[in-house]
């Protein structure tokens, strides 16, 4: 009898959690990235030639182009968003950036670096194509995002998710690998100077709590209590970028 009652309670909890933890839509993802892009633009030089790494559908590249930047975009052929592209995205092997040395004044990525398994080696490629006085800006999922994704995933599917990125063996140790401190150490060890840091000031998870039913304004407020879902880093390989950011 007790076992039956417990199963009934668990089914009820799962039913409720499935309602609140919805499937993520592209429209919701675009709303989040649009808000984040507003923060990014405040941290970038006002003009320049931009390379977006991991461009997905290409709509962030398009948005940057519409704001006066000269934008090129790259992504791997197996990108989940390849079928929904709205902008010209060059496919590459994920290791070698298909551009000449000193081509770009700005390198931009959003929720991309964590998916690169040879992340330290890849920094050499970013250094190579970046002009000496250029900046790199990366938006990266945070420890808070990882923690709350684990919790919401558990509530919805009754299991812990696998690691989201490439550095950690599982989603529990990934909480550390997504920390601000881990990225700061990696960037410094690979020849970068950290010019500025910020957060995206939004709360969301990989399990998509309420999707677009929880608006951006409320997600902004929740981030003050539950933590921001992404960290933002502006990097340079020379002191000359200080006066531009």
How would you label these PLM feature ranges?
Residues 93-95, 112, 171-174:
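Residues marking the start of alpha-helices
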Residues 97-99, 116:
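Helix-loop segment at the mouth of the active site in Rossmann-fold oxidoreductases
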Residues 106-117:
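A short SAM/SAH-binding and catalytic strip from SAM-dependent methyltransferases
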């Amino acid at each position: 009898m007790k076992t039956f009652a417990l199963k009934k309670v668990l089914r009820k909890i799962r039913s409720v959690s499935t309602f609140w933890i919805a499937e993520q839509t592209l429209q919701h993802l675009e709303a989040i990235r649009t808000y984040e892009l507003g923060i990014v633009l405040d941290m970038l030089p006002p003009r320049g030639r931009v390379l977006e790494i991991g461009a997905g559908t290409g709509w962030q590249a398009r948005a940057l182009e519409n704001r006066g930047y000269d934008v090129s975009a790259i992504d791997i052929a197996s990108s989940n968003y390849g079928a929904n592209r709205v902008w010209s995205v060059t496919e590459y092997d994920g290791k070698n950036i298909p551009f000449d040395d000193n081509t770009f004044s700005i390198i931009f990525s959003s929720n991309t670096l964590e998916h690169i398994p040879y992340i330290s080696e890849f920094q050499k490629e970013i250094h190579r194509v970046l002009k000496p006085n250029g900046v790199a800006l990366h938006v990266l999922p945070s420890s808070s995002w990882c923690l709350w994704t684990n919790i919401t995933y558990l509530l919805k599917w009754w299991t812990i998710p696998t690691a989201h990125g490439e550095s950690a063996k599982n989603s529990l140790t990934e909480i550390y690998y997504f920390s601000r401190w881990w990225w700061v150490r990696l960037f410094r060890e690979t020849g970068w100077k950290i010019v500025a840091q910020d957060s995206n000031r939004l709360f969301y998870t990989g399990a998509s709590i309420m999707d677009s039913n929880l608006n951006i304004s409320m997600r902004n407020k929740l981030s003050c209590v539950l933590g921001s879902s992404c960290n933002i880093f502006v990097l340079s390989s020379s002191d000359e970028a200080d006066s531009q950011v």
